[in-house]
């Protein structure tokens, strides 16, 4: 049976997104890494050995990509839960 892999929370201001989720969860998200050529990077909160929460936002250390950033981050007015990923089993 398929299982939840991760939830995706996007924010045009990554620092703000991390602050929101840290405050709501009572945990501290850890840096994940950059998404090269997408202009984004992420922070992660691990729920268990199979499931995590991804906070994704604009990576100010990368050039703006030639295509729109994923999840509509370029046009977002506020952070939001934007998706999820499923583990096929």
Model-predicted segments: where are they?
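Conserved catalytic-core motifs of GNAT/GCN5-like acyltransferases
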Residues: 28-36
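Short acidic/glycine-enriched loop/turn segments that link adjacent beta-strands
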Residues: 37-41
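Short beta-strand scaffold segments in enzyme catalytic cores
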Residues: 43-45
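Glyoxalase I/VOC metalloenzyme domain signal
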Residues: 1-4, 9-28, 47-89
């Amino acid at each position: 049976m398929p299982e939840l892999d991760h939830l995706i929370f996007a924010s045009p201001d990554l620092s703000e997104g991390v602050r929101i989720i840290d405050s709501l969860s009572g945990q501290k998200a850890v840096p994940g890494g950059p998404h090269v050529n997408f202009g984004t990077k992420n922070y992660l909160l691990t729920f268990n050995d199979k499931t995590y929460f991804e906070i994704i936002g604009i990576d100010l250390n990368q050039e703006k990509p030639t295509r729109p950033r994923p999840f509509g981050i370029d046009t977002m007015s506020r952070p939001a839960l934007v998706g999820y990923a499923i583990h096929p089993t």
